[in-house]
């Protein structure tokens, strides 16, 4: 293949996508640690897996190649030294409990096959799994009720956030919250060492070592020349500025970056929870991100006089800013929940705006958001509904659960 990663729009026909099937990490959630691990509730594993399998099969039925993060990660770690390096970094970044010797935990993890190793790291390591030597130190004798040496990673089924495909390259992201920080490490090793990617020198527009956070749920590819990025609870304006400078200096296709400011709260976690593209001239939107007169802060970033300078233009109308950068005379913003104050809040909480376009005018949505789905159909959009009772407990929808790897150009 010429380019193992190629995404130049939000709506081009989806050809290859990366998913993560929910696993043991979901069962390692408990009420005491929900907030720390960024969950509001505990999904029921057998049903969330059934729903995720239905989602994956829905994509396959439309001709999409489905890849799995856990499988690619296991296939990337064929070298013994690479496995050890990966485990060392996971333990360091996961701030594994220092009351057990680092080497003991490392040896335990390395005793598994590659597939089991990845599942164990993702699922977390409980303290009752490892026998430690006789307790001789005070810190060892002190009672500790925290159950994990290595925390589970229940947010991993939202593959959209740790990395994002942009053109023929990608961003490998620094996640804002400590509970998700390790997630992008999997993608770093996959891109560097998996046979599908390693020989292609895939451009990394921004890597996970950059000091300010950015997450894929805030990165939307509007067309070949324009991307939109949310300034949100999870993505920093400084990271957006750095990414824009890197893009403008290292490639010549993307010419504009829209920085769209949204309220910084859990309900509006990323831009794609309140705004997604569903057709050439149609978008879903949660009305609450706009002011009383539809006003909001949008900044158009373009290349400046040199590599470290940007031209920044302020706009206050999302509709007008989109028309300007997309070269459209008209476009439609479809309100989540039909704009009804109750329905829009309820359906946005269950990701009514978080659509996954698999072709122009064809989207995958959660079945529970019936008001928004009906409105999409009334606007000529083909809506493919998927099961959502347990998947939605993680506060992410079909777009959140998928990382496009290859789309056809539009």
Curated annotation (Swiss-Prot):
Enzyme class: hydrolase
Keywords on record: Arginine metabolism, Cytoplasm, Hydrolase
Localization: Cytoplasm
Known catalytic reactions: L-arginine + H2O = L-citrulline + NH4(+)
Active site positions, chain numbering: 400 (amidino-cysteine intermediate)
GO cellular component, one term: cytoplasm
Pfam assignment, any one: ADI
EC number: 3.5.3.6
Keyword hit for Oxidoreductase: no
InterPro entries noted in UniProt: Arg_deiminase
GO BP annotation list: arginine catabolic process to ornithine; arginine deiminase pathway
Family, per entry: Belongs to the arginine deiminase family.
PANTHER family (UniProt xref): ARGININE DEIMINASE
Protein name (database record): Arginine deiminase
Protein source organism: Bacillus cereus (strain ATCC 10987 / NRS 248)
Phylogenetic lineage: Bacteria, Bacillati, Bacillota, Bacilli, Bacillales
Gene: arcA
């Amino acid at each position: 293949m010429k380019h193992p990663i190629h995404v130049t729009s939000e709506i081009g026909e989806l050809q290859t996508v990366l998913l993560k099937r929910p696993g043991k990490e979901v069962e390692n959630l408990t009420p005491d640690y929900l907030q720390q691990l960024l969950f509001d509730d505990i999904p029921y594993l057998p049903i969330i897996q059934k729903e995720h399998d239905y989602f994956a099969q829905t994509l396959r039925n439309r001709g999409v190649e489905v890849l799995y993060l856990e499988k690619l990660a296991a296939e990337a770690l064929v070298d013994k030294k690479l496995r050890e390096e990966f485990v060392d970094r996971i333990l360091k970044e996961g701030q594994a409990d220092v009351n057990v010797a680092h080497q003991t935990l490392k040896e335990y993890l390395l005793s598994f096959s590659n597939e089991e190793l990845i599942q164990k790291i993702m699922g977390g390591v409980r303290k009752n799994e490892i026998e430690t030597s006789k307790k001789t130190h005070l810190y060892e004798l002190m009672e500790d009720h925290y159950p994990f040496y290595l925390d589970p990673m229940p947010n991993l089924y939202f593959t959209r956030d740790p990395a994002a495909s942009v053109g023929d390259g990608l961003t490998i992201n620094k996640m804002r919250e400590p509970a998700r920080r390790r997630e992008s490490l999997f993608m770093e090793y996959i891109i560097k060492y998996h046979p599908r990617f390693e020989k292609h020198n895939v451009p990394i527009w921004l890597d996970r070592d950059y000091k300010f956070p950015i997450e894929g749920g805030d990165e939307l590819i509007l067309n070949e020349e324009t991307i939109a990025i949310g300034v949100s609870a999870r993505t920093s304006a400084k990271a957006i500025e750095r990414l824009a400078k890197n893009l403008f200096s290292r490639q010549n296709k993307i010419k504009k970056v829209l920085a769209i400011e949204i309220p910084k709260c859990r309900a509006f976690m990323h831009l794609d929870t309140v705004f997604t593209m569903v057709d050439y001239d149609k978008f879903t939107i949660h009305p609450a991100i706009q002011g009383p007169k539809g006003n909001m802060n949008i900044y158009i970033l373009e290349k400046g006089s040199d590599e470290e300078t940007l031209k920044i233009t302020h706009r206050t109308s999302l509709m007008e800013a989109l028309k300007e950068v997309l070269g459209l005379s008209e476009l439609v913003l479809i309100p989540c929940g039909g704009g009804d104050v109750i329905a829009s809040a309820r359906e946005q909480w269950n990701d009514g705006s978080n659509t996954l376009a698999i072709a122009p005018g064809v989207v995958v949505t959660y079945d529970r958001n019936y008001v928004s789905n009906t409105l999409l159909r009334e606007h000529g959009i083909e809506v493919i509904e998927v099961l959502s009772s347990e998947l939605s407990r993680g506060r992410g929808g079909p777009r959140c659960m998928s990382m496009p790897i290859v789309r056809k150009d539009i």
